[in-house]
C-alpha cells in the first residue's frame, strides 16, 4: 500500500492498538516509512498548543490597513498568510493571502473584499483532528482560541506536517541555530525556541512554561509588557537582552550569566 494512502487511512479512521502495530510492522515499509506512520499515529495524542505560533509572535494587521502597510507586513513577516483583526487582536475577522494582492489595485484597495474566512480551533484540539479539519475544509491555516474565545496563536498545515516528516524549510527560512554559544560566554537564542527545548540546555537557567510556550513569550509574560530592543532583563542570575526585533515581535535574545557582584548589588 502506498505510504500516502496509508497515512490517509490512519487519519480517517479509529484503529485498535493491534491495527496500529500492523501498520508499523508491515514488512514492505522502509524504516523511514515506519517512522512516518508512527509520527502520524502520535498526532492523536498531541494538542495544537504544543506546536502553534503563540500570539506574541504572530504578525497581524488591522482591517483599516492601507495597501502600503499590508505590503510592508508581508515583506517583514515572509509568510504567505496574515491574520486580520477589527476591534482588537482577539477579534480576528479574516486571513489575507499574499497571492490575493497580485490583482489588487493600490488606488481602490479594500482589505475587506479580499479576506478569507478564518478557521477557528480550540487550543485543546488534537493534531489529528486539526489535520482532518484542514483536509475537509481545504484550508492551510487556523486561528487558535482559548476556552474564553481569546486569540492564542496560529497553526498551519506545514506545522502539522513537520510533526510527521520533520522540518520543512523554504527559501525564506534561515538556518540559524535556536541556541548558539558565543566565544565570549554568551548565548544567542531564537525567541521562538520552545521553553521545553530551551530547558534541555542545563548550562542555561531553566524558565517556567506555565504562562508561555517560547522564550520570547516568557519575557513578555515576565515583564507584563512587550520588551524593548536592547533592554536588559535580569532573571535568576542571568541577563536576557533583546538584540533583535521585527516590529513588536522579539526575534533574538542574548543571554549571559551575571557576575556575582552585579547580582549582589541588585539584591541590595
Swiss-Prot record:
Keyword Membrane listed: no
Function: Bacterial hemolysins are exotoxins that attack blood cell membranes and cause cell rupture by mechanisms not clearly defined.
GO terms of molecular function: flavin adenine dinucleotide binding; toxin activity
Keyword terms, alphabetized: CBS domain, Cytolysis, Hemolysis, Repeat, Toxin, Virulence
Source species of the chain: Brachyspira hyodysenteriae (Treponema hyodysenteriae)
InterPro entries: CBS_dom, CBS_dom_sf, FAD-bd_PCMH-like_sf, FAD-bd_PCMH_sub2, Ion_transp-like_CBS, Transptr-assoc_dom
Superkingdom: Bacteria
Protein name as it appears in the record: Hemolysin C
Ranges for domain CBS: 52-111, 114-171
CC per GO annotation: plasma membrane
Protein's GO biological process: killing of cells of another organism
Pfam family of the protein (one): CorC_HlyC
UniProt similarity note: Belongs to the UPF0053 family.
Amino acid at each position: 500500500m502506498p505510504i500516502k494512502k496509508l497515512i490517509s487511512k490512519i487519519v480517517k479512521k479509529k484503529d485498535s492498538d493491534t491495527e496500529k502495530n500492523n501498520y508499523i510492522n508491515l514488512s514492505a515499509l522502509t524504516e523511514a516509512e515506519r517512522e512516518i506512520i508512527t509520527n502520524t499515529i502520535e498526532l492523536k495524542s498531541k494538542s495544537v498548543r504544543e506546536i502553534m505560533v503563540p500570539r506574541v509572535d504572530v504578525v497581524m494587521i488591522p482591517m483599516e490597513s492601507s495597501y502600503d502597510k499590508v505590503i510592508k507586513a508581508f515583506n517583514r513577516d515572509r509568510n504567505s498568510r496574515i491574520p486580520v483583526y477589527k476591534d482588537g487582536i482577539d477579534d480576528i475577522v479574516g486571513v489575507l493571502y499574499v497571492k490575493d494582492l497580485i490583482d489588487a489595485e493600490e488606488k481602490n484597495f479594500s482589505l475587506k473584499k479580499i479576506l478569507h474566512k478564518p478557521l477557528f480551533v480550540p487550543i485543546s484540539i488534537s493534531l489529528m483532528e486539526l489535520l482532518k479539519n484542514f483536509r475537509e475544509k481545504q484550508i492551510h491555516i487556523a486561528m487558535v482560541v482559548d476556552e474564553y474565545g481569546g486569540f492564542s496563536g496560529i497553526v498551519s498545515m506545514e506545522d502539522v506536517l513537520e510533526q510527521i516528516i520533520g522540518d520543512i524549510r523554504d527559501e525564506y527560512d534561515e538556518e540559524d541555530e535556536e541556541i548558539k554559544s558565543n566565544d565570549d560566554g554568551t548565548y544567542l537564542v531564537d525567541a521562538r525556541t520552545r521553553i521545553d527545548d530551551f530547558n534541555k540546555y542545563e548550562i542555561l537557567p531553566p524558565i517556567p512554561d506555565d504562562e508561555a510556550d517560547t522564550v520570547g513569550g516568557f519575557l513578555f509574560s515576565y515583564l507584563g509588557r512587550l520588551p524593548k530592543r536592547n533592554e536588559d532583563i535580569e532573571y535568576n542570575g542571568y541577563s536576557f537582552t533583546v538584540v533583535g526585533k521585527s516590529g513588536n515581535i522579539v526575534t533574538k535574545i542574548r543571554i549571559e550569566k551575571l557576575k556575582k557582584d552585579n547580582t549582589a548589588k541588585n539584591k541590595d
